[in-house]
Amino acid sequence: MSKLFSEYKLKDVTLKNRIVMSPMCMYSVENKDGIATDFHFAHYVSRAAGGTGLVILEATAVQEVGRISEFDLGLWNDEQVPALKKLVDGLHYHGAKAGIQLAHAGRKAVLPGEIVAPSAIAFDEKSDKPVELTKEAIKEVVADFKRAAYRAKEAGFDVIEIHAAHGYLIHQFLSPITNRREDNYGGPAGNRYKILSDIIKAVKEVWDGPIIVRVSATDYAHGGLQLEDHIPFAKWMKADGVELIDVSTGGLVNVAPPVFPGYQVPFADEIRRGAGIATGALGLITRGEQAEEILCNERADLIIVGRELLRNPYFAKDAAKQLGETIEGPKQYSRAWK
């Protein structure tokens, strides 16, 4: 059997294969209330029907002010749970495990009213200047990640991913470009890591399942985080109880990274080896053979697929065919599956 279609355990959760749907914002909430819609159900459940092992929902705001836009999913109140529970049941029906990415946009929020960040530095000249978070407000952010994790548990999710990448709030704390604080949340790397550590520990108080963290392994900017900075971060995450790091790049500043097939895989490889922690690789992974090479050469443990799954909900089926495998599909599709 190919490695791509072997089982993988995240703590006590067994994935049927190593294909993960990357969290990708859909901006499709209809009433600006954070509640999942029929679109979200069809969108995510179709990828489970297509054979994906773990489907991770898009960035889901833990605070209303933490949305990227007014059309983001949310878990800041109990009314948002039932629609997500229905969605999770749909994923489970097709044999996929269900993950959710908990997030706070920080200074990248595009919302009416006040936005917040570690320091009062705007994303760019066109963006609103954020208000610097007080220590009390930081503690409330941490508490709201915990509350959202509890609601994720109530909805039946198997995996929680904490979004610490792409220039959103936690990434803003991690990077010296955006964190100019002079208290115990700023300055040395250990201080800049503090909010993420606090969030992980708070989530674990209500959540005993696996925790993934998405990071941006380079800021693509002078004075920003580079790969070598993420090795100690990854070691600290492992010590805090994180199971796997989802390794992306960029998003902190307004610069386009160089993009080519597998362009982020070396970052996942280096963090995996340098910190001794499992990683997920992503970045223009489009074929089964490409995914299999990454796994067999032990460059990552999971394959996280984004845009290719937008183009093709049946990526897993096609990847299996490319690798000479046959995977089970929905029984309703059996006459056309093989």
Swiss-Prot record:
Catalysis performed (reactions): A + NADPH + H(+) = AH2 + NADP(+)
Protein residues bound to FMN: S22, P23, M24, C25, A59, Q101, R214, G306, R307
Flavoprotein found in the keyword field: yes
Record GO terms (molecular function): FMN binding; NADP binding; NADPH dehydrogenase activity
SUPFAM superfamilies referenced in this protein's UniProt entry, alphabetically: FMN-linked oxidoreductases
Keyword NADP: yes
One GO term (biological process): response to toxic substance
Cofactor: FMN
UniProt-listed Enzyme Commission number(s): 1.6.99.1
Binding site for substrate: Y27, H163, A164, A165, H166
Keywords: Detoxification, Flavoprotein, FMN, NADP, Oxidoreductase
NCBIfam families per UniProt: PRK13523.1 (NF010047)
UniProt similarity note: Belongs to the NADH:flavin oxidoreductase/NADH oxidase family. NamA subfamily.
Function: Catalyzes the reduction of the double bond of an array of alpha,beta-unsaturated aldehydes and ketones. It also reduces the nitro group of nitroester and nitroaromatic compounds. It could have a role in detoxification processes.
Subunit annotation: Homotetramer.
Protein name: NADPH dehydrogenase
